[in-house]
């Protein structure tokens, strides 16, 4: 179970690479949008599946 848990969560850098943006963009989205980010301790973590669904929903476009 620990292996599956670890595989599901990615950090800011991996999220940026996954979405093709910079780490600064991810941090701005955390502040300004409803990006599915989870704060675990001092770190922001993401699930790839939640990020993909967020992008597909069109919510990643900042108006």
Predicted regions: what is each one?
Residues 1-28:
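Polyanion-binding surface elements
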Residues 14, 31, 41, 57-59:
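Extended rod-forming repeat segments used as scaffolds/tethers
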Residues 15, 45, 62:
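Short, electropositive, low-hydrophobicity segments enriched in small/polar residues
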Residues 19-45:
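Major-groove DNA-recognition helix of helix-turn-helix-type DNA-binding domains
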Residues 49-63:
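A short, Lys/Arg-enriched interface patch at domain edges and termini
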